[in-house]
């Protein structure tokens, strides 16, 4: 039987106090809405439909082409939102999800759908018990323990407010019965809204079975309505991600102080120190050490690499290379194996071959550096003429002395040497020493003549 997910994402989220639609706020690098869609696709769902409203165009742009959308022009309640998706409701199973609930898991969705189908229910609600249920809809059961109704707190009596079983906002419906029930929905409540929760009572009054599937933990159904709740949800997501990596053989020295996005891959026996930030489609190999306060974004790191307190963005680092401390690899830096990029070295849009090193205080921009090359302290690859960027090539086994400038476009041929303090404007031939600096002149007695002698 076909399973569709209708995801409610039309709300303004006024308590977020943000220009950004609520469902587009990110949790561990991915929007809340896309977290929900990912989970739906990872379960048994074959098709996702998102109900958009506030910030509709921005929300649509965040979605992949296979996700369909319907517009709720007026926000008249969750039931009204479901009405807008009526053209997509058929005789299969309809799973209704909340776009601001990113912690729901595939396992829970699969179990809920299985419970719904095996019990031959026409509607099922996912619930849990909560010690402090303030603000949430209460599950009212009859004497036999069956669902009688779901009542929103603003419409609840004092007796109903004392109930601790709460509504998750996640439902399963038989599509054919849901289509029959939707036209019967009324807005006779304190908010003058069409409550989705009333549909369950309607289906029950139609003579069909309504199921209640209770979760043991509240965590999965937490919704985000404020910045504080966003932080709470992200903390849980971070903990989940860290646990997954630790279960796969990664050592995380202080999981509460490491930020890893869901899309990151980390190899076994890698160690992460506090303050590490790993984002995007970063892949880190095995046996690496990622030192404190390192930030790595959309980068591929080989095996046995050590990164100390450095930033690496959109780059690639080969096996057994050492980066940092305080190095900065900007986009399109391709670093080979057994390379050393030391403290306060910046690399941008450059290729650096195996066994080469730039140990400290250098700028390597728009360069092609070969194997076994030494870049001395204070070397600058001068790549910009005020209008255009130009490339510099330093071939294998070359040596660039400290405090030298390589004015692009220029090439240092294989085994070429550049003397310290030189400004190179012409190609250096293979096996040659280039010296491009003024000759030293010593003026004897100058200090005494100027009255500067301290003795």
From Swiss-Prot:
<feature type="binding site">
    <location>
        <position position="100"/>
    </location>
    <ligand>
        <name>Mg(2+)</name>
    </ligand>
</feature>
<dbReference type="InterPro" id="IPR029044">
    <property type="entry name" value="Nucleotide-diphossugar_trans"/>
</dbReference>
<keyword id="KW-0460">Magnesium</keyword>
<feature type="binding site">
    <location>
        <begin position="8"/>
        <end position="11"/>
    </location>
    <ligand>
        <name>UDP-N-acetyl-alpha-D-glucosamine</name>
    </ligand>
</feature>
<protein>
    <recommendedName>
        <fullName>Bifunctional protein GlmU</fullName>
        <ecNumber>2.7.7.23</ecNumber>
        <ecNumber>2.3.1.157</ecNumber>
    </recommendedName>
</protein>
<feature type="binding site">
    <location>
        <begin position="383"/>
        <end position="384"/>
    </location>
    <ligand>
        <name>acetyl-CoA</name>
    </ligand>
</feature>
<dbReference type="GO" id="GO:0008360">
    <property type="term" value="P:regulation of cell shape"/>
</dbReference>
<feature type="binding site">
    <location>
        <position position="330"/>
    </location>
    <ligand>
        <name>UDP-N-acetyl-alpha-D-glucosamine</name>
    </ligand>
</feature>
<dbReference type="Pfam" id="PF00483">
    <property type="entry name" value="NTP_transferase"/>
</dbReference>
<feature type="binding site">
    <location>
        <position position="420"/>
    </location>
    <ligand>
        <name>acetyl-CoA</name>
    </ligand>
</feature>
<dbReference type="GO" id="GO:0000902">
    <property type="term" value="P:cell morphogenesis"/>
</dbReference>
<feature type="binding site">
    <location>
        <position position="348"/>
    </location>
    <ligand>
        <name>UDP-N-acetyl-alpha-D-glucosamine</name>
    </ligand>
</feature>
<comment type="similarity">
    <text>In the C-terminal section; belongs to the transferase hexapeptide repeat family.</text>
</comment>
<feature type="active site" description="Proton acceptor">
    <location>
        <position position="360"/>
    </location>
</feature>
<keyword id="KW-0808">Transferase</keyword>
<dbReference type="GO" id="GO:0009252">
    <property type="term" value="P:peptidoglycan biosynthetic process"/>
</dbReference>
<dbReference type="InterPro" id="IPR005835">
    <property type="entry name" value="NTP_transferase_dom"/>
</dbReference>
<feature type="binding site">
    <location>
        <position position="152"/>
    </location>
    <ligand>
        <name>UDP-N-acetyl-alpha-D-glucosamine</name>
    </ligand>
</feature>
<feature type="binding site">
    <location>
        <position position="363"/>
    </location>
    <ligand>
        <name>UDP-N-acetyl-alpha-D-glucosamine</name>
    </ligand>
</feature>
<dbReference type="Pfam" id="PF00132">
    <property type="entry name" value="Hexapep"/>
</dbReference>
<feature type="binding site">
    <location>
        <position position="72"/>
    </location>
    <ligand>
        <name>UDP-N-acetyl-alpha-D-glucosamine</name>
    </ligand>
</feature>
<comment type="function">
    <text>Catalyzes the last two sequential reactions in the de novo biosynthetic pathway for UDP-N-acetylglucosamine (UDP-GlcNAc). The C-terminal domain catalyzes the transfer of acetyl group from acetyl coenzyme A to glucosamine-1-phosphate (GlcN-1-P) to produce N-acetylglucosamine-1-phosphate (GlcNAc-1-P), which is converted into UDP-GlcNAc by the transfer of uridine 5-monophosphate (from uridine 5-triphosphate), a reaction catalyzed by the N-terminal domain.</text>
</comment>
<keyword id="KW-0548">Nucleotidyltransferase</keyword>
<comment type="pathway">
    <text>Nucleotide-sugar biosynthesis; UDP-N-acetyl-alpha-D-glucosamine biosynthesis; UDP-N-acetyl-alpha-D-glucosamine from N-acetyl-alpha-D-glucosamine 1-phosphate: step 1/1.</text>
</comment>
<dbReference type="InterPro" id="IPR011004">
    <property type="entry name" value="Trimer_LpxA-like_sf"/>
</dbReference>
<comment type="pathway">
    <text>Nucleotide-sugar biosynthesis; UDP-N-acetyl-alpha-D-glucosamine biosynthesis; N-acetyl-alpha-D-glucosamine 1-phosphate from alpha-D-glucosamine 6-phosphate (route II): step 2/2.</text>
</comment>
<feature type="binding site">
    <location>
        <position position="225"/>
    </location>
    <ligand>
        <name>UDP-N-acetyl-alpha-D-glucosamine</name>
    </ligand>
</feature>
<comment type="similarity">
    <text>In the N-terminal section; belongs to the N-acetylglucosamine-1-phosphate uridyltransferase family.</text>
</comment>
<dbReference type="GO" id="GO:0005737">
    <property type="term" value="C:cytoplasm"/>
</dbReference>
<keyword id="KW-0133">Cell shape</keyword>
<dbReference type="InterPro" id="IPR038009">
    <property type="entry name" value="GlmU_C_LbH"/>
</dbReference>
<keyword id="KW-0511">Multifunctional enzyme</keyword>
<keyword id="KW-0677">Repeat</keyword>
<dbReference type="GO" id="GO:0000287">
    <property type="term" value="F:magnesium ion binding"/>
</dbReference>
<keyword id="KW-0963">Cytoplasm</keyword>
<feature type="region of interest" description="Linker">
    <location>
        <begin position="228"/>
        <end position="248"/>
    </location>
</feature>
<feature type="binding site">
    <location>
        <position position="374"/>
    </location>
    <ligand>
        <name>UDP-N-acetyl-alpha-D-glucosamine</name>
    </ligand>
</feature>
<dbReference type="InterPro" id="IPR001451">
    <property type="entry name" value="Hexapep"/>
</dbReference>
<dbReference type="GO" id="GO:0071555">
    <property type="term" value="P:cell wall organization"/>
</dbReference>
<feature type="binding site">
    <location>
        <begin position="77"/>
        <end position="78"/>
    </location>
    <ligand>
        <name>UDP-N-acetyl-alpha-D-glucosamine</name>
    </ligand>
</feature>
<keyword id="KW-0961">Cell wall biogenesis/degradation</keyword>
<feature type="region of interest" description="Pyrophosphorylase">
    <location>
        <begin position="1"/>
        <end position="227"/>
    </location>
</feature>
